[in-house]
Structures are given as C-alpha cells and as structure tokens.
C-alpha cells in the first residue's frame, strides 16, 4: 500500500504574508495528496502509474506488434500506411477493449523499421486522419510537408557515460539545436554534439537546456507549439543521435535538461491532439476554456485523469529513455491561472488563492515534481513563472509545488527598462543590488540578463540596444568608437553583476555570451523562408580581430572564476552602494566584487570596507584580453588597512570596470 502521508504546510513559517492563507495552503497540499491517492488507488507509486508510453502507441512484442490508443469518443479506428498501401482496410481495424481504449495486434512481418503510418479515426459525426497521441517518431514529407508516424525499431543505443551529479548552482546554456549552425540551415543533433558541445564545455557551463525537442509542426514556433509530446524532433536527426548528444554531454560532466511544454498543445488536429477523437475534451478543456487567446493553442485540462497520466508519462519517458537530467517547465504562469496571467499585475497575495487559480494545474505540477524525484532524487526542475506564486520553488513535502528554482524573469525586464529609460549617470546602485537579489528567502532562482525571448525578431538583445548600427562596421579592434566601447564594457559588467548576485543559478542563451548581433527570425513567408537569421555566427567569436572574441573570453573566464572561487556558495553581503560615484561592491565568501558603473569617472585609492586580509585580483573586465584598456594592474596584491575601526581596501577603479578580488591571506589587522 503506497498511501501518501498527510503533512502540514511549512510555507507560513517561511513567509509571514501567507498567514491569512494557512488553510488554503493546507487544502492545496491535501488536494495533491488525495489526487495521488485517487490516481494510484493507494496500491502503487506515481512512477508505477506513469507508464502510458509503454502501453499506448506502437510496440514490438515477442509475437509481433501491438498498437493501442485511447479514444473514448471514437466509434472505429484503423491503422493505415505503407503496409496497407495507404488504404483503409478492415484487417487493420482496432478493437475496443474498454475504458475508451483500442487495440490491434499484428504479425511481425506486417511492419518494418522505417515504414510510415497513421490512424484513421471515426466518430459519430465525422472521420479524419490522426497521428497517435503517444507516437515516439514522426517525420515530414519533403514535398507534401505532410507528417506521418514512423515505425522505429533500431538497435538499442548503448549508453557509455554515467549520469552527472546534480549541479548545486546550475550555470545554464540555453540552446536550440536547429539554429546552432554557422550555416543558413537546420543543424542536427550530431553537428551540435561535434561543434557546440566543446564550446559549451570550454566556456564552463555545467548545464544545457535544450529547446524545441518535442515535435512541432511549425519550425518558426521555436518549439513552443508542440504536436507530438513523445517524439524528438525529426528535423535534427534520429532519437539515437539525440541520445548520443546527451551521452556525450554527460561524459563532459554537463547535465542536460529539457525545455518541456506542458502548458498547452498546438491546435492542429491532423498532427496533434486537438480534437483527437472527434471531441475537444479528451486532454484539453472543452470550448473557449480550452483555447488560449494569445497563443492560439489548446489548453490542457489538468483535472482529467487522462491528461495527468499523459503528462506524467511524458516526463518519465524523457528521463528514462533519453537520460534527461531534468526539466525547465515553460509557461507555468499560463497553467496556474484561468486567465493565463495575461496583462495581470500580481500585487496581492489574494491573487494566488482566488477563483482565477487553476488548482488542478497546481496539483499536476506538484505531482510532476514528486514523480521525477521518485525516478531520480537529484533531478533538476525549473519553473518559468512570472506571477510569483508562493511555494513554487519549495519542497512538496513541506507544502510547496516542488521546483528547485524559478526563473527570475524580472531581472531581464529590469535591464531592458534601465537601458531604454535611463542614462548611464541615472543608474541607482542600491536599486541594482536589490533587483539582482530580490526573491523570497525560501526560494532559489535562475537569474539571466536575456534568454531567447529577448533575441527574437521585433525585440533586441542588450548589446544591440547599446551598440545598434555600429555592430556592423565598428566591432574591429582596429576601429575606435565610443558607442562600441560603452556597449562592450557594459555587456561585461551587466552579465557579471547578474551572475555574481544570483541566488541559485544563471542562464545564457546560445550566442549571447559573445554579443551575437541582430535578432532571431525563423524561416517564414515574410522573410522569403530564409535561414539567414536562424543561425549563430560563431566565426565572430573566433576572430581575434573582432571585439566579439573578447566578450566570448570574458564570459568563459567569468564563469570559471565564479566556479573556481565558489562565489555562489555563500550569500552576497553589500559593502558599498555609492549612487553618486556609481560604485557597487559586495562580498561573497572570500571574494570581493567591485563595480564602477560611472560613464566618465575613474577613482584612485577608492575605499571599500571589507574583511581583513590580503587580496588578489582574479578577474578584471578591463583586461585587454577582453578588449578592455588595461588600466588595472592585476599583478598587485591588495592588503586591507585599518581605518576608523574598520578594515578597508584602497582600489583603483577605472570607469565602466569591474574586478573580482580573492582573499589569499587572512590577517588580523583591525583597529
């Protein structure tokens, strides 16, 4: 008997603002417990339950093949494809076996590896082709652009490397396989493995977040309009090539997490699960409630057992078959609220507990986190939530929803707003420190300057906002340009302060580390179906005559500095927030991090009060290696001196420069 224990929520102890909602939190916790009990009948674990991918769909057996599908609204189902010359034949009709399930068993010789097939679904008012809901391999015809399921039964992939340990502080490289090539084309899993993984390893990232893996009909959706939740995208290669990519990353000590889409489904009916069995309510909400008015997609009904089973099985499938180390859940805000949080300012705790909250979605997310930890206790889960839902990144056994981290989405907004609305001499150091560290004490976050969202067409990356047109003709090391100098300097400082003040982890989108120019624009009718802006120009980072190369080296050394000196192992302590001088300094462990954001002023013998000791510079943004001006003497050591009952460092701080100093010797020089 696997009955979930009844526990009391501990959230109120962590957040006193939740005291008026103590009973609501307890009900939420109890709801998840009872839902798990209902799903498992108290006879098994969530992991035992989440095996839909092993039951439904097409599977090889000792006797031949078995195919099963859930379609309670259907009156007849047929398999058809290469094996039937694409004709609907009675010998390939499925049999109803109860509870809305259908089944057919076929001799081994009927199907061969690589054959294409579909479902013909018949319901009371119509009939149409469908792809199986649990299909694990889908391909698209080059000419007709029609999608079909594919029989996929290759030799089993042999895993070579053990799973890496969970990073305490994920330094995440957000990547899209398809647009990772230098060439104007769709890249592949194999090319990514051969050319991009070594770059990521050299830069020092310990986690890769792979986007657009779940199959999606429209390449330009960036992978966020999913049709086939169990099928890795055919565009990039075979499932085994994806396995090899992940296996190779594991051999480098890098974790790989999936950007999983459980917030909605593409509305396409032939390719996806919209109106799958002729109804619009098998996995999604009925009617308007099931339509996302902004995304134009289908919204899951998390109160349905079929939906919970489908989505939980999906998580187990990706973890067990492909060895993903965790998930970044996209669109969590959209899941948690019936209005999807659209245009809403979350200003009151009442908004987290009113009738707009989809409690079924909260329950699903809680069960999802329980499941993945049953499968692997050191799994990594991240929530993309802009609402600030309490308990999002808090253990389920203590009343939380269970994620390890939530995305700190306000930081990216802060940087955009700052660059758009304030001149450099209007930056506020106290506000900057607060914005970088603003979070609930009980939750950890993933900080980032910009992710893929800021790079899309219609928006601008931060460096493009700062340098604009000069990125095309003034990034040469042989060209002097004040706008470029400012942009290069601030690009380094903004990324360093975001990373060194993060509370849990850090994320960067592929190419932004070196200030990739321009925007992302996937092939579409409006751009002549061009891949010109759906690629990454790695040659810019590799060309030492361009300042992109210095930004790339700075990103590498910044990450290695943070890891080697264990900066993130202790909380930041503010040492200086001088608004007039635009100087910000703080301590993390044995390191002191100092920023001079002033656009013009450099300071000699600037006082920073800190712990007594002898310090050495371990990172200097002004180093010529990073296309700085070399005004800081990194060979010096800095010894604190007593001053007015404290200990102080006297530092030379050039304008728009940051330095990281590490204590190399403890001293007791204190007044």
Protein language model annotation of sequence segments:
Residues 113-117, 634-671:
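C-terminal beta-strand-rich structural cap/linker in extracellular carbohydrate-active enzymes
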Residues 67-71, 77-81, 598-614:
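Surface-exposed beta-strand/loop patches in extracellular or lumenal glycoproteins
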Residues 139-140, 157-167, 172, 176-357, ...:
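Substrate-binding/active-site clefts of carbohydrate-active enzymes
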Residues 139-145, 323-325, 344-531, 563, ...:
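Conserved alpha/beta catalytic core and glycan-binding cleft of carbohydrate-active enzymes
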Residues 61, 440, 586-589, 651-653, ...:
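Active-site beta-strand termini and strand-to-loop segments that position acidic
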Residues 69, 119, 175, 200, ...:
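Conserved, mostly hydrophobic/aromatic
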Residues 369-370, 376-377, 536-575, 660:
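Aromatic- and carboxylate-lined catalytic core of secreted/periplasmic carbohydrate-active enzymes
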Residues 2-66, 71, 87-89, 93-174, ...:
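The feature marks proteins involved in alpha-glucan
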């Amino acid at each position: 008997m696997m009955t979930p224990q009844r526990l009391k929520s501990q959230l109120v102890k962590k957040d006193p603002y939740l005291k008026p909602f103590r009973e609501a939190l307890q009900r939420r916790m109890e709801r998840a417990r009872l839902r798990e009990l209902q799903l498992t009948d108290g006879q098994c674990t969530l992991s035992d339950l989440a095996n839909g991918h092993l039951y439904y769909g097409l599977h090889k057996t000792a006797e031949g093949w078995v195919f099963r599908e859930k379609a309670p609204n259907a009156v007849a189902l047929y398999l058809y494809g290469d094996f039937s010359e694409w004709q609907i034949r009675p010998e390939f009709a499925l049999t109803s076996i109860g509870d809305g399930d259908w089944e057919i068993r076929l001799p081994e010789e009927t199907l061969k590896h690589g054959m294409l097939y579909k479902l013909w679904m018949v319901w009371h008012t119509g009939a149409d082709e469908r792809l199986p809901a649990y299909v694990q391999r889908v391909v698209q015809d080059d000419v007709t652009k029609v999608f079909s399921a594919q029989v996929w039964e290759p030799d089993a992939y042999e895993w070579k490397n053990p799973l890496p340990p969970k990073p305490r502080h994920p330094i995440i490289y957000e990547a899209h396989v398809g647009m990772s090539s230098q060439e104007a084309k769709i890249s592949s899993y194999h090319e990514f493995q051969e050319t991009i993984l070594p770059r990521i390893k050299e830069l020092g990232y310990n986690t890769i977040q792979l986007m657009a893996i779940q199959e999606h009909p429209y390449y330009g959706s960036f992978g966020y309009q999913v049709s086939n939740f169990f099928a890795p995208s055919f565009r990039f290669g075979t499932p085994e090539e994806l396995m090899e990519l992940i296996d190779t990353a594991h051999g480098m000590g890098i974790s790989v997490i999936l950007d999983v889409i459980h917030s909605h489904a593409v509305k396409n009916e032939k390719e996806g699960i919209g109106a799958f069995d002729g109804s619009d309510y098998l996995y999604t909400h009925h009617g308007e409630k099931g339509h996302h008015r902004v995304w134009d997609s289908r919204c899951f009904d998390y109160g349905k057992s079929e939906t919970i089973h489908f989505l939980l099985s999906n998580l187990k499938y990706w973890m067990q078959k492909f060895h993903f180390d965790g998930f970044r859940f996209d669109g969590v805000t959209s899941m948690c609220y019936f209005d999807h949080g659209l245009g809403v300012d979350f200003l009151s705790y009442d908004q987290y507990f009113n009738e707009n909250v989809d409690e079924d979605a909260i329950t699903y997310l809680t069960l999802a986190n329980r499941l993945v930890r049953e499968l692997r206790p050191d799994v990594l889960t991240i929530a993309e939530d802009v609402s600030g839902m309490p308990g999002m990144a808090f253990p389920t056994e203590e009343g939380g929803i269970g994620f390890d981290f939530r995305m700190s989405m306000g930081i990216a907004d802060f940087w955009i707003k700052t660059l758009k609305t304030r001149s450099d001499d209007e930056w506020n150091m106290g506000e900057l420190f607060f914005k970088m560290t603003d979070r609930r004490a009980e939750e950890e976050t993933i900080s980032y300057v910009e992710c893929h969202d800021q790079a899309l067409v219609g928006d601008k990356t931060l460096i493009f906002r700062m340098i604009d047109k000069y990125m095309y003709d003034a990034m040469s090391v042989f060209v002097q340009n004040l706008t470029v100098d400012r942009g290069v300097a601030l690009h380094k400082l903004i990324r360093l302060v975001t990373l060194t003040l993060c509370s849990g982890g850090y994320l960067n989108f592929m190419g932004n580390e070196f200030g990739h120019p321009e925007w992302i624009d996937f092939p579409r009718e409006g751009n002549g179906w061009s891949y010109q802006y759906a690629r990454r120009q790695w040659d810019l980072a590799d060309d030492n005559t361009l300042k992109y190369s210095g930004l790339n080296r700075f990103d590498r050394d910044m990450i290695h500095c943070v890891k080697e000196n264990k900066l993130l192992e202790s909380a930041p302590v503010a040492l200086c927030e001088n608004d007039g001088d635009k100087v910000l300094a703080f301590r993390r462990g044995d390191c002191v991090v100092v920023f001079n954001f002033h656009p013009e002023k450099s300071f000699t013998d600037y006082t920073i009060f800190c712990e007594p000791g002898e310090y050495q510079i371990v990172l200097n943004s002004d180093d010529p290696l990073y296309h700085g001006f070399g005004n800081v003497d990194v060979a010096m050591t800095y010894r604190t001196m007593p001053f007015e009952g404290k200990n102080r460092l006297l530092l030379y701080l050039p304008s728009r420069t940051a330095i990281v100093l590490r204590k190399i010797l403890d001293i007791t020089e204190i007044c």
